[in-house]
Amino acid sequence: YRNNTSSSRTLLEAAANHGVRNIVFSSTAAVYGIPAGGRASEDTATQPINPYGTSKLMTEWMLRDLAFAGGPKYVALRYFNVAGCEPGGTIGQSTPKATLLVKVACEAATGRRPGVSIYGTDFPTPDGTGLRDYIHVEDLATAHLDALRYLRNGGEPTVLNCGYGHGYSVRD
């Protein structure tokens, strides 16, 4: 909560006090929790099941309230699972500290890691592993730029999902 809620509150207060007009916020699909039917649209009820999702949702609420009070307008981008890197390797999962599934799988495939551990094999899916909707890091960067353009052109505060709308099992 310190990073995603308290620090965000401090940042939003400073932005409002210094005349910032537009904010693009990196949120998460974790705000949905486990949606009925397995799919989440922007209209799906938010019911986070972990502190990460709750803390991001709290920041979305602060953005909403600040915009309603005449502060900056915002677009909250709800990321699903970010994967990949840009060709030069400066952003994304080619960086040394990246620990996400796709990076781990690539390291295993190239012999830099002994294998991939799969946690959770009792999901109600054909192979028992969780389904994930991945989005490439470059497409996510484009979404940020598009969101900023939208706000600069007079767009109203909104929330957008950032994924492709198709899930792959962890084992896939």
What are these regions (language model features)?
Residues 19-23, 71-73, 114-115, 154-158:
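Active-site loop of short-chain dehydrogenase/reductase
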Residues 26, 53, 92, 120, ...:
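Glycine-centered small-residue hotspots that permit tight backbone geometry or close packing
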Residues 23-25, 75-81, 117, 133, ...:
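Structural signature of the Rossmann-like NAD(P)-dependent dehydrogenase/reductase core
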Residues 31-32, 82-84, 140, 165:
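Conserved sequence/active-site signature of Rossmann-fold short-chain dehydrogenase/reductase
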Residues 15, 67, 147-151:
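Hydrophobic pocket-lining residues that define ligand/cofactor binding sites across diverse proteins
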Residues 2-10, 17, 21-22, 30-81, ...:
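Catalytic helix-loop patch of NAD(P)-dependent Rossmann-fold dehydrogenases
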Residues 102-172:
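C-terminal substrate-binding subdomain of Rossmann-fold SDR/epimerase-dehydratase oxidoreductases
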